[in-house]
Amino acid sequence: MSAQTGSTNVSADKGKGKSVAEPQDVTMGEGEDSSSEDDVRSQGLKTAAREHYLTTYIAEEVEEEASDNEIDKSNIIQGRRTRGKKIDFAAAAKDLPAEDDEDEDDDFQSEGEDDDEMGGN
């Protein structure tokens, strides 16, 4: 019987059920010295000072960005949009210089040429 009791305890720990939380000591102020409280206060002050600095710095940065938003009108290029326009690509192709395709074809080998060289027949 004792062997069965030990195995049931082990199988109970392996289930999917909720586990029972271990009790924690929640006493406040007993046995603590004042130096740890001072450390907590100083950390809180440091954190507050850091947050204040970051908030101030970010606010100044946003104000600078707001003043940079003005657009210089001389940088705007007019007449280059093609939305809604009909483009005659045939006429545009006539205006372009003829391309020299001979240079691209010099290194091209067709599949038939490779077969003749490899076969040796």
UniProtKB/Swiss-Prot annotation:
Localization terms from the record: Nucleus
Keyword Lyase part of the UniProt annotation: no
Main location, first listed in the record: nucleus
Compositionally biased intervals (Polar residues): 1-11
UniProt-annotated stretches for the region Disordered: 1-45, 62-121
Keywords: Chaperone, Nucleus
Cellular component annotations (GO), alphabetically ordered: nucleus
Biased composition annotated in UniProt, kind: Acidic residues: 98-121
Keyword hit for Lipoprotein: no
InterPro entries: Histone_chaperone_domain_CHZ
Protein family (similarity comment): Belongs to the CHZ1 family.
Oligomeric and partner information: Forms a heterotrimer with H2A.Z-H2B, stabilizing the association of the histone dimer. Also, with a lower affinity, forms a heterotrimer with H2A-H2B.
Summary of the function given for this chain in its UniProt record: Forms a chaperone-bound H2A.Z-H2B complex that acts as a source for SWR1 complex-dependent H2A to H2A.Z histone replacement in chromatin.
Protein's recorded name: Histone H2A.Z-specific chaperone chz1
Biological classification of the source: Eukaryota, Fungi, Dikarya, Ascomycota, Pezizomycotina
Gene from which the chain derives: chz1
